[in-house]
Amino acid sequence: TFPLFTDLERELAKFKNTEKALVFNTGYMANVGTISAIADKNTIIFSDALNHASIIDGCGLSRGSVKAYNHCDVDELKYLLKEVDRNTRKLIVTDGVFSMDGDIAPLDKLYELSREYNALLMVDDAHATGTIGSGHGTAAYYGLEKEVDIQLGTLSKSLGSVGGYVAANSVIIDYLVN
């Protein structure tokens, strides 16, 4: 790895308040690559119905099964989670700010459900970084930087560059690298 990439990943991890970050060539590839790597055939992915196309494509390319819940409907998500065995691998994935209407995901409630039902929580902050709260994204907006398992984003919107990234703990980032 080039030192420049290592420096960028370190700064992104600091920016998102996570242990590590990993850069991708685009935000689209960050979503597709992360979801398809994490979700195996034994994983159920719970995806907001209005998630970005890159999330939908990542879910489709993964080997996991997908259950879409109505937009920002935490009650429906809870109902769907209740139907699944607690020991089944689960991934809840959402946009932080939805690009088509500007809604902010109820990340605080999604976090509570992720812990109650033993699920990983992933948020795509492509449209949240630089636009809400301190500019650090949805997890920071809700004060959940250390709690959200996976934060993704792009460098091509408010950060004015190219590329994408995933920020998470060392175990998740090392898994994605290997």
At which residue positions do the language-model features occur?
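A glycine-/small-polar-enriched, mobile loop at the entrance of the PLP active site in fold-type I
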Residues: 1-6
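Short loop-beta-helix segment that forms the pyridoxal 5′-phosphate
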Residues: 9-33
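Conserved PLP-anchoring active-site segment centered on the Schiff-base-forming lysine
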Residues: 34-53
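Short, structured coil segments at secondary-structure junctions
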Residues: 41, 61-63, 147
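Active-site phosphate-binding strand-loop segment of PLP-dependent enzymes
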Residues: 67, 71-123
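Conserved active-site segment immediately N-terminal to the catalytic lysine
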Residues: 118, 138-156
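Conserved core segment of the aminotransferase class I/II
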Residues: 150-152, 162-178
